[in-house]
């Protein structure tokens, strides 16, 4: 039994703690719904325009976009489903990145009449 004690898998948190300072970054994933409360779904060209005009200038070092399908339990007790886009950003944990991310959330909500843009943050260790 004592031999097995050394076989535990370290947690993700421990991995970040042992990451070299130069490799410590933040991963933020934003989830953008594509349905409007009224009217047509947000089109591919509208999404591309948002990425090209709003996201890329703020995160020039790179980004990743995934097609997604979201669902949640509405206040009415019914499951709502919606096509979505997930935008993954790897960035420094700094005030400018924070400002840029919040700007993107605000722009998208305003431009496309969205109630929210979900945000998930986690520390990561990045190597190229």
Feature-to-residue mapping (PLM):
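Terminal, regulation- and interaction-focused segments at domain boundaries
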Residues: 23-44
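Bacterial signal peptide processing site
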Residues: 8-10
């Amino acid at each position: 039994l004592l031999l097995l004690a050394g076989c535990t898998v370290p947690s993700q948190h421990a991995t970040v703690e042992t990451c070299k300072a130069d490799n410590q970054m933040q991963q933020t994933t934003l989830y953008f719904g594509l349905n409007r409360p009224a009217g047509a779904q947000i089109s591919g060209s509208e999404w591309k325009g948002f990425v090209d005009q709003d996201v890329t200038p703020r995160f020039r070092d790179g980004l990743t976009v995934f097609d997604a399908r979201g669902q949640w339990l509405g206040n009415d007790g019914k499951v709502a489903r919606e096509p979505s886009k997930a935008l993954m950003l790897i960035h420094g944990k700094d005030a400018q990145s924070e400002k840029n991310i919040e700007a993107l959330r605000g722009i998208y909500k305003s431009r496309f009449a969205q109630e929210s843009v979900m945000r998930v943050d986690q520390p990561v260790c990045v190597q190229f």
